Every structure is written in C-alpha cells, then in structure tokens.
Design a protein with these regions (language model features):
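Extended beta-strand/beta-hairpin segments
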Residues: 1-46, 57-138
Length: 138
C-alpha cells in the first residue's frame, strides 16, 4: 500500500508528504495561486516519465549500454471538459552518445512500455499513448 498525506498550506497551496520527500503543489497567479509549487497534471506527466525512465536506466545498466545523455520529453493533450483529462500523451525518449546501440535501446524502451512501467499502464486506461525514440551521435 502507498500512502501520501497532502496538507493545505493556505490559498491554493498544498504540500504532499511522500515516503521520500515533500512536493509543493500550487497554481499560477493567473489561476488564483502564488505559483509556489508544481501543477498536478504536470506531476502526472513527470511521474510517467520518471517511472519509465527508471526502467530504461536499469535495463541500460543490465545490457551494459553506453549512453552519454538520456532524457524523456513528455507532452499531454487535454480534453476541453471542465475537469480536463489527458486524452493523448506523447513520450519521446532521446538518447545521445558515441556508441549507441539503437536496437537494444529500443528494446529497453519497449520493455518499459509494454511490461514494467505501472504508471504507463495507468495512463493507457484513459489516454492514447504514443512512443517515439530519437538517437543523437556525438
């Protein structure tokens, strides 16, 4: 079981106490907040990228792949509803290095997407998830 306690800090600000730290949540001044924290929907995209990124990093280590830089760019499109939800999410895995093994890196991404990342499985229940990979030789 996971447990997170989220406490109101006044106005539109909250703090979530997680097992490994605290996350501040707020909205921008244009929405009545102070802009002093993360926005909830952006945190969802960050959780998705972080979950899959941990899988891919672990697999890169196990496969002994040489990667100089690795980042994940995640974009989500929201519905127009009052309670807007993501209906489409694109995740772009970007690898840079001198000796990139593209097939093995794509395998690591696919294993995360199809087998290991629980956050990915949650997103797939409510959004179309598109996966892209990019490789940059340096």
């Amino acid at each position: 079981m996971h447990k997170v306690v989220t406490e109101w800090k006044g106005n539109m600000a909250f703090e979530s106490n997680l097992p490994d730290g605290i996350i501040k949540i707020d909205v921008p001044e244009s929405q009545g907040g102070n802009g002093s924290g993360m926005r909830p929907k952006a945190l969802m995209l960050s959780s998705l990228a972080g979950c899959s990124g941990l899988d891919v990093a672990s697999l890169m280590k196990k496969m002994r792949l040489k990667v100089d830089d690795f980042r994940i760019e995640t974009e989500g499109l929201l519905t127009d509803d009052d309670a807007a939800v993501y209906h489409s999410v694109t995740i772009r895995y970007v690898f840079s290095g001198k000796e990139l093994e593209k097939e093995k890196l794509e395998k690591a991404v696919n294993l995360s997407v199809e087998k290991y990342c629980g956050v990915m499985k949650m997103f797939e229940k409510f959004a179309e998830v598109k996966i892209e990979t990019a490789f940059h030789k340096i």
